[in-house]
Amino acid sequence: MGLIVDTSIIIALERGKISTKAWSNYDQAYINPIVLTELLIGIDRVKDENKRGQCLTFIEYVKSLFTLLPFGIEEAYVYAKIIDNLYKERITIGVHDLLIAATAITYNYPILTLNTKDFKRIPELEVLTVPLKD
């Protein structure tokens, strides 16, 4: 069974707060283009060239760890359905999180995140988390 990994987990990995063992019980761990985009946005904010180089190296490492799932037509339909359902309930969640959730729901994979507060409000989404190291 697969697993979608959220950006919060990857940031915790970069900071040494979790290890890759966090998803080792799953056959395959995936990210979607939105997770990659969020990481790239962070790089654009880094002004120090050495730090920027380290960030780019880390992103290459992330790309080697995970399979990148596409965000296509089916995911777009699921995304629209999620937004409609949340709108009816007057629930607001960030667009990026909803796009990541749509990918997880489309593939029927749980999502591994540290942002359980938002993701648990999305129906049909199985949300998993891990404890952080000190």
Swiss-Prot record:
What EC number(s) would the UniProt record show?
Answer: 3.1.-.-
Tell me the domain of life: Bacteria
**Alphabetical UniProt keywords:** Hydrolase, Magnesium, Metal-binding, Nuclease, Toxin-antitoxin system
Please verify whether the record's keywords include Nuclease: yes
Q: Write out the residues that bind Mg(2+).
A: 6
| Any Pfam family matching the protein | PIN
Positions of the PINc domain: 4-124
Cofactor(s) recorded for this entry are: Mg(2+)
Q: Can the keyword Transmembrane helix be found in this entry's annotation?
A: no
Gene3D superfamilies, alphabetized: 5'-nuclease
Among the GO molecular function terms of this UniProt record, one is: metal ion binding
As for what it does, the entry says: Toxic component of a type II toxin-antitoxin (TA) system. Has ssRNase activity. Its RNase activity is partially neutralized by cognate antitoxin VapB. Rapidly induces apoptosis upon microinjection into mouse fibroblasts (L929 line). Probably contributes to host cell death if bacterial cell lysis occurs during host infection.
Q: Which family does it belong to?
A: Belongs to the PINc/VapC protein family.
Official protein name in the record:
Ribonuclease VapC
Source species: Rickettsia bellii (strain RML369-C)
Q: Could you tell me the gene encoding this protein?
A: vapC
